[in-house]
Amino acid sequence: QLTFTSSWG
């Protein structure tokens, strides 16, 4: 899930 947040950030 952290990877998804990084993609948005």
UniProtKB/Swiss-Prot annotation:
Molecular-function GO terms, alphabetical: hormone activity
InterPro entries: Adipokinetic_hormone_CS (IPR002047)
Glycine amide sites (modified residues): 9
Annotated transmembrane regions: none
Keywords carried by this UniProt record: Amidation, Flight, Hormone, Neuropeptide, Pyrrolidone carboxylic acid, Secreted
Predominant cellular place of this UniProt entry's protein: secreted
Annotated positions of the Pyrrolidone carboxylic acid modification: 1
Intracellular or extracellular location(s): Secreted
GO biological process, one term: flight behavior
GO cellular component: extracellular region
Function of the molecule: This hormone, released from cells in the corpora cardiaca, causes release of diglycerides from the fat body and stimulation of muscles to use these diglycerides as an energy source during energy-demanding processes.
Entry similarity comment: Belongs to the AKH/HRTH/RPCH family.
This protein's name: Adipokinetic hormone
Record organism: Helicoverpa zea (Corn earworm moth)
